[in-house]
A protein has these predicted regions:
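ATP/NTP phosphate-donor binding region
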Residues: 1-69, 79, 316, 323-331
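Glycine-rich beta-strand-to-loop/alpha-helix junction loops that act as flexible
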Residues: 9, 72-74, 96-98
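Short N-terminal binding/cap micro-motifs at the start of the first secondary-structure element
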Residues: 12-16, 210, 309
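Glycine-rich phosphate/pyrophosphate-binding beta-alpha loops
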Residues: 143, 147, 202-216, 291-292
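ATP/nucleoside-binding phosphotransfer catalytic cores, i.e., glycine-rich phosphate-binding loops
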Residues: 189, 220, 230-331
């Protein structure tokens, strides 16, 4: 088995390449992994993790080996590597959460579990669904509307001197709330057409995005379904109340919207979703696992069990136990 560690020095607030390589060397020795069986590489441009993971997957397949890829960065770095190994049955990707959001792991466990190198090397691979989207492959959530517009606006404010990540985020929110709120959007959800004045929507394989917004608190990443949440257009006063409910995941319990959320949310389960602007105001901004761009039409389709990911030992054991229990319930 080959193991590749991909370190993104620009992810998060601190450069992980300063201390992580030595920690990897120590953990690998404890796990009995010989120096020639693993490689540490540092990414240096956008898309580099995808390129390195793809090259390693090709090489491992040619030599008949299994490949483990661990990304040290955020959701964007993880998604790049996942895209790089897509279609390679011999490869799987795990994440060491050194980014600012790290939403992918929240569906499976805690940040502490995923930072534990010993647990990571003792864990194992599982198969999950992926989403093929207009922004590329996604493991977690594809969102469109107000939240995506905020994310899209952040780089502009980061270019202002002394305006760091948190300040850029706040300024982007203020800009959006001071502008026109809501879009008329036409949705096609497994053949059902909905024409909605909406604030935003989230098409979910995982549970959280945006640094902890629990959009889909009961999503199962290996059930072959997308959980779709549409938030109707509301007043600025109501937005704060809705976003508080949405962030905590309290809008959805026991397989349905809670009563307080019903006037504001639309919920569906689907295999394929597409949406386009129906108000003549140009493209809709969408975001998915680190990618963010305006699109004339956004299409999302589930790819059942198309991804192989690595989970640290505690999360791997929980995941396996849950699936065993579900299989027993079905029989």
């Amino acid at each position: 088995m080959r193991t590749l560690f991909l370190l993104n020095p620009t992810a998060g607030k601190a450069d992980c390449t300063r201390t992580l390589p030595q920690q990897i060397n120590v953990a690998a020795a404890r796990a009995g992994i010989a120096p020639e069986e693993y490689t540490i590489q540092v990414t240096n441009h956008a898309g580099h993790a995808r390129e390195l993971a793809n090259a390693a997957a090709q090489q491992a397949r040619q030599s008949g080996e299994e490949l483990r890829v661990f990304t040290a960065g955020g959701d964007g770095t993880f998604n790049e590597a996942l895209t790089g190994i897509y279609g390679y049955a011999n490869a799987a990707v795990g994440c060491l959460p050194f980014g600012s959001g790290n939403d992918f792991l929240r569906t499976f466990g805690t940040k502490e579990e995923f930072l534990d190198l010993d647990a990571q090397l003792a864990g194992g691979p599982v198969s999950i669904d992926l989403m093929q989207t207009s922004l590329g492959l996604s493991a977690t959530i594809c969102a469109a509307g107000l939240d995506a517009q905020v994310a899209y606006g952040i780089p502009k404010f980061r270019r202002i001197p002394l305006c760091g990540g948190e300040m850029a985020y706040v300024l982007s929110i203020v800009e959006q709330l001071c502008g026109h709120i809501g879009r008329r959007v036409e949705y096609t959800i497994d053949g059902e057409t909905l024409d909605v004045d909406c604030l935003m929507c989230a098409i979910c394989n995982g549970r959280t995005y945006g640094g902890g917004f629990c959009a889909a608190p009961e999503a199962q990443p290996d059930d072959g379904w997308l959980d779709v949440y549409i938030i109707r257009k509301v007043s600025r006063v109501t937005i704060a109340k809705l976003l508080g409910m949405y962030k905590s995941g309290k809008h959805f319990q026991n397989g349905q919207l809670v009563r307080a959320a019903e006037p504001y949310f639309i919920y569906r389960r689907a295999k394929q979703v597409s949406l386009r602007a129906a108000d003549g105001r140009g493209p809709i901004v969408a975001t998915a696992d680190g990618e963010c761009a305006p699109k004339e039409q956004i299409t999302v389709q589930v790819q059942p069990l198309a991804g192989r990911i690595l989970l640290p030992k505690p999360a791997f054991e929980r995941f396996a136990a849950q699936r065993t229990a579900q299989s027993a319930d079905r029989t």
